[in-house]
Amino acid sequence: MRPILIAGNWKMHKTQAEAREFLRELGLALRSSPSGSASQRQIILCVPFTDLAVVAEQSRGSDIAVGAQNLHWEDQGAFTGEISGPMLAELGVRYVIVGHSERRQYFGETDETVNRRLAAAQRHGLTPILCVGESQQQREQGLTESWIVGQLDRALQGIDLENLVIAYEPIWAIGTGQTCAAQEANRVIGLIRQHLGNAQLPILYGGSVKAGNIDELMAQPEIDGVLVGGASLDPQEFARIVNFQALAPA
């Protein structure tokens, strides 16, 4: 059975003091939940570099795993502003987002550099969360499948599928309030899994995930969890997402 992962991506939000307060409030919200379902799900918080040590310390012994939002493919060197796999591993980081659409859009990330970052993460015992997805224009042109397959083929050369998470994040649904229909997300994630030889690795959905749509998303058989953006900044909202109750298929 594939694991269920609920990953929050804080992006460039929260000081250390705010991170401590978030974890305090999240802990209270999860403990007061009547469902008790949180213990059956892996919670991941992918936080800014400055928050990693605080979150790792505060979440020790809990169900929360710490994730980073990027890493360099080299272990050390003259790469101003970057961070390496050994640095993250030393802090207790277990997961790292690679190839997020914002990294591709704003910082020139390519499938080739994504491939190198994936290899670096796995080399140091980190589990990468590879993000793939299509733009609005590609969607309208009917290129969703071919675009995502191309991203996968280029990024996954030489990568171990046994230590990998994939997140399908349609770019047009990120931070826009538009959510990909649950059935459509399930279809695309099924296509990804089929392209990878029905690999049993976790595949998540990301794109305007919130408490109001999590139950329907998690009722889909191919969706193994979610990568949550803005809704992960509110501890009460994030707790409701963690404690989803999957709806019965219509």
UniProtKB/Swiss-Prot annotation:
Coiled coil: none annotated. Pfam families: TIM. Substrate binds at residues 9-11, 175, 208, 229-230. It catalyses: D-glyceraldehyde 3-phosphate = dihydroxyacetone phosphate. Its EC number is 5.3.1.1. Signal peptide: none annotated. Its main location: cytoplasm. GO terms for cellular component: cytosol. Keywords: Cytoplasm, Gluconeogenesis, Glycolysis, Isomerase. The keyword tRNA processing does not apply. It is found in: Cytoplasm. The active site is at 100 (electrophile), 169 (proton acceptor). One of its GO terms (biological process) is glycerol catabolic process. It comes from the Bacteria. Belongs to the triosephosphate isomerase family. Homodimer. Involved in the gluconeogenesis. Catalyzes stereospecifically the conversion of dihydroxyacetone phosphate (DHAP) to D-glyceraldehyde-3-phosphate (G3P). This is Triosephosphate isomerase. The gene is tpiA.
